[in-house]
Swiss-Prot record:
Enzyme class: lyase
PROSITE patterns (alphabetical): METHYLGLYOXAL_SYNTH, MGS
Protein name: Methylglyoxal synthase
Keywords: Lyase
NCBIfam families: MGSA, PRK05234.1
Length: 125
């Protein structure tokens, strides 16, 4: 039995509405994959897209970014979609850098904005 691809969905506070809109627009495509998301983002997506089965980890500032980073390092997250807000100062910016660094180190497809995420989801489909 083949394991389904696991996609991580994360969004900064000012990008959460955009992530929810993205998930709604691609709900059918995303339903083919296992989804993991940070706590708040995952809850918002789950409310908007009840057909998706989302595994929620802790909120980003409480360690959720690091939990997903560990999943990338273990090979259990194969795609990262992280809507970053480059205009807001973030107290957990070090965690964000560590997460995107791991995405690069382990050479997984990674989208940091909606335009790239749109292309990535179409390529996976």
């Amino acid at each position: 039995m083949t394991q389904r691809l696991r996609i991580a969905l994360i969004a900064h506070d000012q990008k959460k509405d955009d992530m929810v809109a993205f998930a709604r627009a691609h709900e059918q495509a995303l339903s083919r994959y296992d989804i993991v998301a940070t706590g708040t983002t995952g809850g918002l997506i789950q409310d908007a897209c009840p057909s998706l089965n989302i595994h929620q980890v802790k909120s980003g500032p409480l360690g959720g970014d690091q939990q997903i980073g560990a999943m990338i390092a273990e090979g259990t997250v194969e795609v990262l979609i992280f809507f970053i807000d480059p205009l807001s100062p973030l107290p957990h910016d070090v965690d964000v850098k560590a997460l995107t660094r791991l995405g690069s180190v382990y050479d997984i497809p990674m989208a940091l904005n909606r335009a790239t995420a749109e292309k990535l989801v179409r390529a996976l489909d």
